Curated annotation (Swiss-Prot):
An outer membrane protein that may participate in pathogenesis. Some human Lyme disease patients have antibodies against this protein. The Mlp proteins probably undergo intragenic recombination, generating new alleles. Residues 1-17 form the signal peptide. A lipid is attached at residue 18 (N-palmitoyl cysteine). The keyword Lipoprotein applies. It comes from the Bacteria. It comes from Borreliella burgdorferi (strain ATCC 35210 / DSM 4680 / CIP 102532 / B31) (Borrelia burgdorferi). Belongs to the Multicopy lipoprotein (Mlp) family. This plasmid is not found in the completely sequenced reference strain B31. One of its GO terms (cellular component) is cell outer membrane. It is a lipid-anchor. It is found in: Cell outer membrane. Keywords: Cell outer membrane, Lipoprotein, Membrane, Palmitate, Plasmid, Signal. A lipid is attached at residue 18 (S-diacylglycerol cysteine). This is Lipoprotein MlpB.
Amino acid sequence: MKIINILFCLLLIVLNSCNANDNDTFNNNSVQQTKSRKKRDLSQKELLQQEKITLTSDEEKMFTSLVTAFKYTVEKLSGDTNGCNNENKNKCTGFFDWLSEDIQKQKELAGAFTKVYNFLKSKAQNEAFDTYIKGAIDCKKTLHKIVIIITNMEKVRTKRAYFRGVAGSIFTDNNDNDGIYKCLKDELLNDTSNHYEGLTSDWDN
């Protein structure tokens, strides 16, 4: 009888031990599932946030015009003695390819470009904006007002458009996309710069 009692006690100990292991396994699985669920929820939240960022029609229009203006400028100035060479052309292409994946940065640049865009659009009158700007870059229009550039602290009037001066600054002095982005945004927002003053001064209307 004593032997039976001993065996029964041993059986209870074994069962309790197994149950404890099962509980540990269950708890570990629960923790892992909770972590996985949180990670999945976070990823979905980030994805939803990215999906919410879109350009308005006006932002898209301004950003497209900005890209067109600078690509056209650098294309025209390839090989020029002012530093807008093939290296800058490659930087420009690479930069806007990089920017095409980041809607938030596109929104920020469109916003920064608003003041310049609206000013030039008011001068374009009935002419399409991109056509008007390309004409200025080609120096075929009467946009010689967009030509004041500061050299050795003196104002010099040349047949250089606003976009040429800015393009020279951002692509010549920066070697990475983040640097180009920051410089471009700062230039567009700076309404006290030589480029902006040259753009907006001495208009007849």
